[in-house]
A protein has these predicted regions:
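Conserved ABC ATPase "signature" region
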Residues: 70-77, 122-144
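Conserved ABC ATPase signature
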Residues: 148-153, 157
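The feature captures the beta-strand-to-loop junction immediately N-terminal to the Walker
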Residues: 41-43
């Protein structure tokens, strides 16, 4: 897709991450733009998912993780001691590789977040459910079976439900970690179409091994690979059309053309 330059939503500078003494990411500096899709690409083990999880501090859940450098959301640091991490994760939602619906009804999956934020009136909750499902094109399919277990849905429906659950708390950014890799081609196409539509309102950052997917739907692409010290580094960051048509680094060209990966 052609990149349209919006305002910067997330910015990193001299960003490093360590797992104990292991240096996982080195000196990552990127500006991620609002209302766009940014694809993080690179070989397995280079730190793509680690970088993605920095943006809503999911790495905090791993013992021994240390982050150095600058990570800004709307120009405000998200790694201050007084950062409200719960509020951050409301603003920056996440959808994982495999559908992780909760073992409860479709309806309860969607209202659990809003209820946690204090929404109690049934009318408000019902409206949130309808709007969230409409956003992921599931309302017509599910409106008559909302009390059925979410686990009864197909994998593709479950993944769209997970996206709807993230949308129910009104995020600004949506992180998607290989969110189509466990789905069949038809479900993948629906999720891709959904991402393009959602990018009109939200900032979307995806991790993908699928170069054709990155080429099809992303506006910007960040290519990461490990260096000679086995540390993940940013090789190239550019509008996707530019990177795929005219990569500026030989390693980028070798990766996107399938010479390694």
């Amino acid at each position: 897709m052609a990149a349209t330059q919006h305002s910067v939503k997330i910015s990193t500078g001299a960003l490093n991450l360590y797992y104990g003494s292991f240096h996982a990411l080195r000196d990552i500096s990127v500006d991620i733009y609002d209302r766009s899709i940014t694809a993080i690409i690179g070989p397995s083990g280079c730190g793509k998912s680690t970088l993605l999880r920095i943006f809503n501090r999911m790495n905090d859940l791993i013992h021994g993780v240390r982050v150095e450098g600058r990570v800004l959301l709307d120009s405000a640091s998200i790694y201050e001691k007084n950062t409200d991490v719960t509020a951050l994760r409301k603003r920056v939602g996440m959808v994982f590789q495999r559908p992780n619906v909760f073992p409860m009804s479709i309806y309860d999956n969607l209202v659990i977040g809003p209820k946690h934020q204090g929404v109690k009136r049934p009318q408000e909750l019902n409206a949130i459910v309808e709007v969230s499902l409409q956003q992921v094109a599931l309302w017509e399919e599910l409106k008559d079976i909302l009390k059925k277990p979410a686990l009864d849905l197909s994998p593709g429906q479950q993944q769209r439900l997970c996206i709807a659950r993230a949308l129910a708390v009104k995020p600004e950014v949506i992180l998607m970690d290989e969110s189509c890799s466990a789905l069949d081609p038809e479900s993948t196409m629906k999720i891709e179409d959904l991402m393009v539509e959602l990018a009109k309102q939200y900032t979307i950052i995806i991790v993908t091994h699928n170069m054709e997917q990155a080429r099809r739907i992303s506006d910007w692409a960040a290519f990461i690979m490990i260096d000679q010290d086995k540390v993940g580094t940013l090789v190239e960051y550019a509008p996707t059309t530019h990177m795929f048509a005219n990569p500026q680094d030989q390693r980028t060209e070798d990766y996107i053309t399938g010479r390694f990966g």
